[in-house]
Amino acid sequence: MEDLRKDYSFQKNKEYEETFTSTNTNLILDLMGADKYIDLSQTFLDIDAGIDGVAKIEKENIGIALRIRKPDYFKYRYNFTLGHHFDKENSQVHAILNSLRPDVMSPNFILQINGVDENGYCEECVAIKIQTDVFARYLKELIQNNTLDNLFVPRLASYEFQMKDVFHETNSGVDYYYIENNTITKTASNDDN
């Protein structure tokens, strides 16, 4: 599939994510229920395994794939994104599917926050946290049914999943958050179903 994004800069996008991480460590800690967050941006774990950071929860270290979206994508604010088509080596689909393999490192959770401004602030954001191995089983099913490509949006060069579909298609491992002024105001978990 062709990448139809206009004026996309990987470096600018990375700087945008890093601005969020540096100004919102406490929000990441709250979303993950963690004591400490270690940023791994641009390290080999980020580049090769898709692990942007590690959340420390007591003695456990949890790998996180972090996704941050700007308010300009308001139309997609209730979507969850995996970048790049599956046939590309750098597709985020591969990092997620790796969670089903015991012989490679992969993120334990995907944390996507939609609506973050250029300064890393969440005036009105929505977030979804997904346990990677749970989502990988759903992804694998979509691949086997030849339906994954139905979710690919060439203009964004990404797969776009509606958060509500991910929430209902998996039986656990998905948490949903509303954030106002960098503070979590509402939560929902499909573990509660």
Task: Report the location of each language-model feature.
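Conserved hydrophobic/aromatic positions in well-ordered beta-strands
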Residues: V54, L111-I113, I128
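Short, solvent-exposed coil/turn segments at beta-strand boundaries
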Residues: E58, M105-S106, Q131
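Catalytic cores of nucleic-acid endonucleases
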Residues: K6-Q11, R67-E123
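Acidic-basic catalytic patches of nuclease active cores, encompassing PD-(D/E)XK
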Residues: M1-I47
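Short, well-ordered alpha-helix to beta-strand connector turns
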Residues: A34-D35, I51, P107
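Non-catalytic C-terminal interaction segments of nucleic acid-processing enzymes
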Residues: G115-N193
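Charged, well-structured alpha/beta interaction segments
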Residues: Q42-E58
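Conserved catalytic cores of phosphodiester-cleaving nucleases, focusing on short active-site segments
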Residues: G53-F74
